[in-house]
Amino acid sequence: MSKRTTYCGLVTEELLNQKVTLKGWVHNRRDLGGLIFVDLRDREGIVQIVFNPDFSEEALSVAETVRSEYVVEVEGTVTKRDPDTVNSKIKTGQVEVQVSNISIINKSETPPFSINEENQNVDENIRLKYRYLDLRRPELAQTFKMRHQTTRAIREYLDNNGFFDIETPVLTKSTPEGARDYLVPSRVHEGEFYALPQSPQLFKQLLMISGFDKYYQIVKCFRDEDLRADRQPEFTQVDIEMSFVDQEDVIQMGEEMLRKVVKDVKGIDVSGPFPRMTYEEAMRRYGSDKPDTRFEMELKDVSQLGREMDFKVFKDTVENNGEVKAIVAKGAADNYTRKDMDALTEFVNIYGAKGLAWVKVVDDGLSGPIARFFEDSNVATLKDLTQAESGDLVMFVADKPNVVAQSLGALRIKIAKELGLIDENKLNFLWVTDWPLLEYDEDAKRYVAAHHPFTSPKQEDISKLDSEPQNAQANAYDIVLNGYELGGGSIRIADGELQEKMFEVLGFTKEQAREQFGFLLDAFKYGAPPHGGIALGLDRLVMLLTNRTNLRDTIAFPKTASATCLLTDAPGEVSDKQLEELSLRIRH
């Protein structure tokens, strides 16, 4: 077997008239009777190779036996293609390789789906079962090349700015906050369990107390939660922590790193500083704490109509401390039928809204089911509050503020997608700041941390923990990209007494706090520096940089929506002996 001289996807005009040795997979084969053309593929791309009896009758006879996905080695000379056969869609499209010798390294059975097509109609379960074949597709190969470029850019930036790459434990202690833990039973300590980390949060804080000053890690994290298109049970996090910093320092670092990533991976210069928006403003204007700012259609408060109109739904809502908000789909009045509006009503029902009121703005006023409730003065108020014009579709939700925000925020995205308002080539970064420190859990009847229990309140709000904890703001910041939460960070609590107070507000007894987090409270006794950081979802970042819509396309061997691996059939049963060693028994 000869040594490969270059990759298939790197054979360009620079190699004209040179001999090359290539190895790869048969992507496509065309027999034109006397001449055989093969597209040979490897991770760098595809090159056309030609079997011509004038060059080698022996090679031609072997080529007659090869089929799709055979692994072959070829030797040949790079020549220029005829002008009428140039393929401008690929970087090797100006040349071809005249083959003088071919060896079949390994044969292939007929794959369960075609590798040389987009496979949009192939059942995803089939793709995941044969993931090693799915990953051969040039489209996915390019995605993982960009993933590598992304991690390389991140490491380069952090390495060049004084960060240490330090690993933290994978087997750790289960803590009650956040999502469910994946538990690992201990054989040595009967009846006791490790947990796989949801985040290296506490360890990175301990590393700051240890004096390492700047830490990072590209790390696997695990959460046993219900899945959706942008969630996986195991995911990769870019974890960063810094000592002696404030919020501005972390934000500046995050922006510099992300600008380098986008420049290195996509060749795009992202201007800075990134826009910022408070949590309150994001919820008020977009109905989301991760707003997609690539298009307008902001939520407009029209509660004034509830005080002026004789429309019971609006009126009762406002009188009961609710609110009425609207979104305006510009020029979309003719795009939606009554049946379409019924479907949109069902959509907002998912988010708790009792209904969706709507009107279409026409030249002489309004049309639609509730148009009759609008006096001329009400129409004027509506237009003044929303800037609605003739041809626009106006949709209203009247309910409790959180229901209004969630339902209209989701509807805003749905309408924008249906009307094609989103520029998929845009990268709109946004910082969301000034988060509430706490959220009230109606089921548990207690406060829970909006981010996590180690987030510091703003200095001026520390006193509120005793009297009005619901009004305390966090020293927290999220980075949003195109409507997705890319990452979140905060300045951490670095004082033992304040951390104990935070646990108390969250409903922990002193004994519970000591039992679960005693090691952290002890560490605070030995001189903790002020510190803060951020964690970015690498899988999600790659998904957005590659214009993917499914997180699974950015993970080499992902799980399904039900957290199974169709390739390996994980999770699976284990033997009685294994269970016995762990002192476990399965109860059906």
From Swiss-Prot:
Its EC number is 6.1.1.12. Signal peptide: none annotated. It catalyses: tRNA(Asp) + L-aspartate + ATP = L-aspartyl-tRNA(Asp) + AMP + diphosphate. InterPro entries: Aa-tRNA-synt_II, aa-tRNA-synth_II, aa-tRNA-synth_II/BPL/LPL, Asp-tRNA-ligase_1, Asp-tRNA-ligase_1_N, Asp/Asn-tRNA-synth_IIb, AspRS_core, GAD-like_sf. GO terms for cellular component: cytoplasm. Residues 201-204 are annotated as: Aspartate. One of its GO terms (biological process) is aspartyl-tRNA aminoacylation. It is found in: Cytoplasm. PANTHER family: ASPARTATE--TRNA LIGASE, MITOCHONDRIAL (PTHR22594:SF5), ASPARTYL/LYSYL-TRNA SYNTHETASE (PTHR22594). Homodimer. Belongs to the class-II aminoacyl-tRNA synthetase family. Type 1 subfamily. This is Aspartate--tRNA ligase. It comes from Staphylococcus haemolyticus (strain JCSC1435). The gene is aspS.
